[in-house]
Amino acid sequence: MKSSDIDQDLFTDSYCKVCSAQLISESQRVAHYESRKHASKVRLYYMLHPRDGGCPAKRLRSENGNDADMVDKNKCCTLCNMSFTSAVVADSHYQGKIHAKRLKLLLGEKTPLKTTATPLSSLKPPRVDTAPVVPSPYQRRDSDRYCGLCAAWFNNPLMAQQHYDGKKHKKNAARVALLEQLGTTLDMGELRGLRRNYRCTTCSVSLNSIEQYHAHLKGSKHQTNLKNK
């Protein structure tokens, strides 16, 4: 095939195969074929695909070399298939990432593997050792034989289970828990009297339950007597 036939195949009125450019109108065709970009790509194309069928030039000219068969590295980079308008542009390319990456691939060097970020969902929170919650001695179940809170004895575990789930035990447990809560606000005399009965010595009144006693302590009458005491 003649070189003219090759040129006609590469450069048609509607498509430039060297630049992979679609040419729609006459003005676009003329502007493209006369552009500097097209000329540079054509020059590089024939460097890589000589018309005489010989091997493409792959060696770069040395600093003082005069070998005409070698390619000027300041004009084009055969490795990246790029042409340059000046030595400054060429130097910028050779120091860039694209050229360095292709050079590593050519030399067979392995590119470092990218470290993948660990998903947040797979990160486990640090373990925090917390002290075990110790129940109040009045709330926990003493044994299957005896309940110290209610002073009750059991013949078997089933009877003990029924007692601990019953109203009497729960009421006594709630009463003791409330006494422990009130212990921070009452003096020892009031606390000892409360353990025997539900009587308020400040107001000289007796209540029927620990709940009523607790409500009385929060009432306005008790607060007034407490201030005037």
Curated annotation (Swiss-Prot):
**Record keywords, A-Z:** DNA-binding, Metal-binding, Nucleus, Repeat, Zinc, Zinc-finger
Q: Name one GO cellular component term.
A: nucleus
Localization, UniProt: Nucleus
Write down a Pfam family by its short name: zf-met
What name appears for this protein in its UniProt entry? Zinc finger matrin-type protein 4
MF terms (GO), sorted A to Z: DNA binding; zinc ion binding
Per UniProt, the Matrin-type Zn-finger stretches lie at 14-44, 72-106, 145-175, 198-228
Native source species:
Bos taurus (Bovine)
Q: Which domain of life is it from?
A: Eukaryota
Annotated region (Disordered) at 117-137
Asked if the record carries the keyword Zinc, the reply is yes
Q: What is its main location?
A: nucleus
Which cysteines share a disulfide bond? none
